[in-house]
Amino acid sequence: MKHRLLLLSAVAMLVMTACEKPKMEVYPRCFSVSETTQVFFSPGNLQYDGTTKKYSFAPTQMTVIGGANRNISDTYGGAIDLFGWGTGNNPMMSSTVGTDYATFVDWGSKMDEPGWRTLSFEEWNYLIQKRPNANKLYGSCAIVNIMGGKDFGMVILPDTWDCDTIDVSYSDNFLKHQYDSELWKKMEKAGAVFLPTAGDRMGNSIAISSVGNEGRYWSSTPITDGCAHYIGFGDFVNEESDGTLRSHGRSVRLVKEITSPSQIPAAK
């Protein structure tokens, strides 16, 4: 009888172990976007050069193009960083009709380096709301440069953030959390991501007041014909966007999935 009980106990343990979800390995300077997927972010917002016909990343996480996005056209030779939804194959598209953007072509698929992609809305939502300690790992903030100027945006911290002396708990006020350039360098080296307030474009019109005050970042998720999900923030964080017309020009921040430590970029 005793042996039978021990055998039943062992079988029960095996069944319980088999039913447990495998734990995802947590990598440094990376971000969970689901229970099974970690990513790292590109070093800056996506840009497109009308002369070279090439995509690239902004030179810093704070860099935005601003009002020059209004020049968008098939013949424009300058750079833009506000894109209609899913325009990876036609970044200079400026139609104001949402249904003209019927098919999502990921900008990441057009990068010279493979593997880049756009987060889905579900992944954005998991990153900001559902991962462990989510409300302590993002918030509106200001990066203060050496001249005293302020770059407003949203900071997002990696899963393994361990700089407890730096307050980055959720805030809906840019000025509550201000980081000088030296502190920001340390945060960035530890994996902090900054999404700048690059503004919003519609056709060839851009509200200048939105540049430096509002951030709108596309997801890959459509809603209905002509509309798609995005994440938006200003002196607020609106991670539960109901969506907007696909014809809006919005920011793009690409990611890469991590499956081994060798894929993680070296800390700068």
What are these regions (language model features)?
Residues 15-18:
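C-terminal motif of bacterial Sec signal peptides marking the signal peptidase cleavage site
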Residues 24-268:
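Conserved positions within compact, well-structured domain cores
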Residues 2-8:
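Sec-dependent signal peptide recognition
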Residues 20-22:
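Bacterial signal peptide processing site
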Residues 11-13:
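Repetitive helical segments and hydrophobic/amphipathic motifs
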